[in-house]
Amino acid sequence: KGISLDVEKGQVISIIGPSGSGKSTLLRSMNFLEKPNKGKITFDNTEFEVEKMTKKDILDIRKYTTMVFQNYNLFKNKTALNNIIEGLLVVKKMNKEEAEKIGLELLKKVGLEEKRDFYPSQMSGGQQQRIAIARSLAMNPKVILLDEPTSALDPELVGEVLKVIKDIASEHVTMVIVTHEMQFAKEISDKVVFMDNGIIIEEGTPLQLFENPQNNRTKEFLKRYIQRS
């Protein structure tokens, strides 16, 4: 099945659709956590043919993209601050003082300055996800990929994570988000993509997709969502 998706600089794109529709697979294939079978990826005017990509090509793409996972994926034996700066020290070879300065600024940005020396086990799920988002920002990526960032959270913790993502979006950071939070997708996105059965069924602005969907499958999905909420 073929998929074609354009992401412009500074855009926030939300990918919605039923479970098992291929949303996360599409997201993970953007930075080669899952390798696409064939096709082309164009990044910053550089075109890559998937079948011919070398390890260096894949590393180059990963340098400019960061991923925020459902289950945070923090290092359990590192503090909040050390989780954030790990990539700066190991990948970017930054000196510790400079890395910590960036890390502390990002802790402030996600509202967790007081948690700098806390370990993941001492923090709530919402706090851990905010640290994971700060870690992804530390690498100064060109694109942040977020895979259902609130799906593992207790309902009362969802809001704090969505607020952080909204704040980042307001700074025109390019983001692609897989989400089941429809109201959030409606508010934050420049473009919403509806997927089902491994293909893109419909895409458009939030107004187009939520208020005036053209495809019957999109209408059916959104109708169920409205009934549930």
Model-assigned labels for residue ranges:
Residues 203, 207-229:
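C-terminal boundary and immediately downstream tail of ABC-type ATPase nucleotide-binding domains
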Residues 1-206:
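ABC family nucleotide-binding domain
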